[in-house]
Every structure is written in C-alpha cells, then in structure tokens.
Swiss-Prot record:
Keywords, alphabetical: Heme, Iron, Membrane, Metal-binding, Monooxygenase, Oxidoreductase, Signal-anchor, Transmembrane, Transmembrane helix
Cross-referenced PANTHER family: CYTOCHROME P450 714B2, CYTOCHROME P450 FAMILY MEMBER
Pfam annotation, one family: p450
Gene: CYP714B3
Superkingdom of this protein's organism: Eukaryota
Protein name listed in UniProt: Cytochrome P450 714B3
Cellular component per GO, a single term: membrane
C-alpha cells in the first residue's frame, strides 16, 4: 500500500513538473518569442526601438521615465512657478519616454508592453496613408480593451469590423449639420445656470472673484449631451456623469496583467471598483431607457436598432448601454476639457480674448446666439482650433492591423498596434512653422491643415462623428462667457497637463473673473 502511495505521489509530482515546464514554455513563447518575431520583421525594414526585457517589454523604462517626470513637476510646483512658466508642450511631462525614443530612433520606432508590440508613427507620409486607409482590416487598437471594458464595452469607440460599421450608420446621422443646427437653442439654455452662477459669485465678492471652472463646465457639457442626445435633464443624468467620471479614474491606468493574459476578471481592488461602477451606470442608463418618451433623438435611434436586431435581450441591452456610455464619455468629457483649456489660453492672452469679445458683439448685435451667428465667428473658430492643436483631448490616434498591411511603404504584421502621437504631429515645426509652441490662432486664418498634420478629432474613416456638435457646443459656451466676463489667469493656477484617457488639467483651471457689458445673451436680452 505504501509503495503504491509513493508511486502515486511520484507520478503526481512528475505530472506537476511536466505541467509547470509546459506552462513555462508556453508563457515564454507567448510573452517573448512571438513579440520578438514581430520586432524582427520591423528590424528587417530598418525600423528599430528600445530593447525589451522579459516579460514586461519596455514597461520598466516607461515607468522610470514617468516617475522622473512626475518628480520634476512636483519640484517645479514646490518652487512656486505657478502659471508664469507655461510651456505649451506637455510631452516631456506626460509622455517623456516617447520623446526620448523618438529622438533616439526617429519618427518610426517599435516598443512593447508585455507581449503587445507597438509601432509609434510620426512620419507624415505614413500617417497620411494610415488616415486614408478605409479597409476594415485596419481597426481600433485592442490594447487596453480589457482595462477599459467596464467603461466602453463593445460600443462604437472600441468596436471593429462590421459591428463598428453598423453602429456608425446608426449614430452618424444624429450628428449631421442639420441636426446640430436644431440643437443650438438648447445649448444656449444649458449655459444659463453656469453664467448666472458665475455672475452671482462676482457680485457677491465685490465685482471680482477667482473660480476653478472645471466642474461647472462639466455640468454644462453633461447637460447638453443629456438633453440633446438622450432627452433627459442634467438633474436626472447627474448621477450617470458622476459615476462615469469615477469609472474613468478607475480605468485610467493600464491593467498590465489583463492586457498580457486577457484575465480581466481577476478580482483586484481596482477591478472590483470598476465592475461595481459599471453595474451602477448600466442600471441608471436602463432606467432612462424605460422613461424615454417619443422624442426622436440619438437614444431613440439606438433603441430602434436594438429592437429590430435579431439578438437576445441581454445582447440588446449591452448594445444600448455600451453605446450610451461611449457617447456620454466622448460627448461631454472631451468637450469640457477642451473648453477649460480654451478659457485658460484666453485668460493668458487678453489680446485674443478682446478680439473674440468684439467679434461676438459685432456678430450678435443684441440678438441671441444662433447657428448663423456661430458660422460668422471666425476669430473664435481659430482660437478653438489653436486650442485643439496645443491641447488635443486625445493623446493618440490608435489603430491595429487586424490583418497584415502595407502603409506608407511599411509592412505591418497582423496584430501590431499603431500609435500616432497627436501632439507630436501638432508640434512639428516643419508642418507648422518655427512658432509651433506658441499660441497663435492666426495660423488658421487662411490655411486648411493637411490631413496628417492636424488630428484633434482623429482622421480618416474613424474621424470623430460628433466634431460638428462639439465645435457648436464650444463656440456657444466660449462666446457667452467672454461676452459677460473678462478672464485672467488666476495666481493660483498651476499648469498640470496629465493623461487620464484624455489630456486634462490635473489641478484644474483657476481664473479670475470680472463682469463686462454684453449684448449676446439668452433670448437676445442685453445686459
């Protein structure tokens, strides 16, 4: 009996050893040999990059560079530099490793994160070819899909192929120009609580006050997207936006284990928080769906598509919830952050603030803002365009080769993630001139940027569907604010760009406000 037990133990141990060896070989193959083969294909094309290490690729180098940059920022804040030392180039602070590698390896280089290989592209001819590619074989990058699953799911921001094409056909018509024109009055109405609140604060503080503007602008943008696209007031949608904001924070850092192994269900503290927030957001969205009336809006279009699709109830609900979450996030967070950057720049450049204010006065002449007056605000348009050049919400245009492709003369193996650094394209002196890091809206006065040089809304087949909507929303808010207030950058402002899915001011935007006479207000009432 004892002999048999001993033999069984030996067999079991042998099997465990064989299994462990097999797992080790498999992991070595997946985490090292496979990405090395891909990197070798790029090396054959004279495309290099930093040397990866097993098993995390270049993650250690990236973290070290990011930590050093963070320490440098903290030191600068302690020294009291405040807003006086603003440089309109966030790359060394936010993405220091990419800048280092680009200088070492040129405008096209490779790197890896775990077993995921990336091609970092800032060479204009290759960027142009990527943007012009309409093949479904070039899709949205799947990297971070596991990390971002609770926020985006299978919605339009992350889907590929026929699924993405189907969603685009549903959502795109809701953001056509004629639809956006019909939303202008509603956008003006949504701005009134913000304007009245700021006016009351200025009056209460003797005609001048400091305001951290971020939350108020998010409230405005949230109200606009709720009412125009989903028919719900901000009061009803407020909880959704708060939860989505929390969810954004929860998934803003890569989950390396999930991305390398696909094990997104590992019950870490962050995963548990994200799952709980996802459940809460899902519940709130489905409640709004049940309460939705007969109004024709984006929500009704999504509901109609879900009801006519030959899928089960659970899949239909996922379709509704994932796309609502995607639109909530893209439709209010990016716009709110851009508005904050724009007001910061106007506070920093009073000459352009005056030009915009005078233009609004001349165009409106005591009448309410409407779609026609928005089209005539050329200076304001240039200011917003320049804001989007210096502070694009999206740090990258990300794509993935779903099949082997050749773009710009570069052979790209299947599965490779392609990252185009938007800020690098926007700050290329060969594309924009020697004053590339200066705020100069005049550069947009008579020149239409080339497809590969200006990417605030992406480009090509996956260009942001809501860019017309976002521009109208930004024009309305900025025009109403500058027509009522003089803006100055507060002494408390600290320049703090950071990347949390989008590039936002980590410490917010602090402005000093005083009132001015205005003729461009709600329903044409002069003040």
């Amino acid at each position: 009996m004892e002999v048999a037990m001993a033999m069984a133990v030996k067999v079991l141990l042998s099997l465990c050893c064989v299994g462990a060896c097999g797992l080790a070989v498999y992991l070595y193959h997946i985490l090292w040999l496979v990405p090395q083969k891909v990197l070798a294909k790029f090396e054959d094309q004279k495309i290099g990059g930093p040397r990866p290490s097993f098993p995390y690729g270049n993650l250690a180098d990236m973290r070290e560079a990011a930590a050093a940059a963070k320490a440098a920022r903290a030191s600068a804040r302690r020294s009291g530099s405040g807003g006086g030392g603003i440089v309109h180039d966030y790359r060394p602070a936010v993405l220091p490793y990419y800048e280092k590698w680009r200088k070492e390896y040129g405008p096209i280089f490779t790197y890896s994160m775990g077993n995921v290989v990336f091609l970092h592209v800032s060479r204009p001819d290759v960027v142009r070819d990527i943007n012009l590619c309409v093949s479904l074989d070039l899709g949205k990058s799947s990297y971070l899909k596991a990390t971002h699953e609770p926020l985006f799911g299978g919605g339009i921001l992350k889907s590929n192929g026929e699924a993405w094409l189907h969603q685009r056909k549903i959502i795109a018509p809701e953001f056509f120009l004629d639809k956006v024109k019909g939303m202008v009055d509603l956008m003006v109405d949504s701005a009134q609580p913000l304007l009245m609140s700021w006016e009351e604060r200025v009056d209460r503080n003797g005609g001048i006050t400091d305001i951290k503007i971020d939350d108020d602008i998010r409230a405005y943008s949230a109200d606009v997207i709720s009412r125009t696209c989903f028919g719900s007031s901000y009061i009803k949608g407020k909880e959704i936006f708060m939860k989505i904001r929390e969810l954004q924070q929860a998934v803003s850092k890569p989950n390396v284990l999930a991305e390398m192994t696909g094990l997104r269900f590992f019950p870490s503290m962050r995963n548990k928080q994200a799952w709980e927030l996802h459940k809460q957001v899902r519940k709130l969205i489905l409640e709004i769906v049940k309460e939705s009336g007969e109004d024709r809006n984006l929500l009704s279009a999504i509901l109609h598509s879900a009801s006519t699709s030959r899928v089960g109830i659970a899949e239909a609900e996922n379709f509704i919830v994932d796309n609502c979450k995607s639109i909530y996030f893209a439709g209010h967070e990016s716009t709110a952050v851009t508005a904050a950057w724009c007001l910061m720049l106007l506070g920093l450049h009073p000459e352009w603030q005056n030009r915009v204010r005078e233009e609004v006065h001349e165009v409106c002449r005591g009448q309410p803002v409407d779609s026609r007056s928005l089209q005539k605000m050329k200076n304001l348009t240039m200011v917003i365009q320049e804001t989007l050049r210096l502070y694009p919400a999206g740090a990258f245009v990300s794509r993935q080769a779903l099949q082997e492709l050749k773009l710009g003369g570069v052979h790209i193996p299947k599965g490779v993630n392609i990252y185009i650094p938007v800020s690098t394209m926007h700050l290329d002196p060969e594309l924009w001139g020697p004053d590339v890091k200066e705020f100069n809206p005049e550069r947009f006065s008579d020149v239409r940027p080339q497809l590969h040089s200006y990417l605030p809304f992406g480009a090509g087949a996956r260009t942001c569907l809501g860019q017309g909507f976002a521009m109208a929303e930004l024009k309305i808010l900025i025009s109403l604010i500058v027509s009522k207030f003089v803006l100055k950058l507060s002494p408390h402002y600290q320049h703090s760009p950071t990347l949390k899915l989008i590039v936002e001011p980590e410490l917010g935007v602090d402005l000093t406000l005083t009132k001015v006479q205005s003729v461009c207000t709600k329903r044409g009432t002069a003040i």
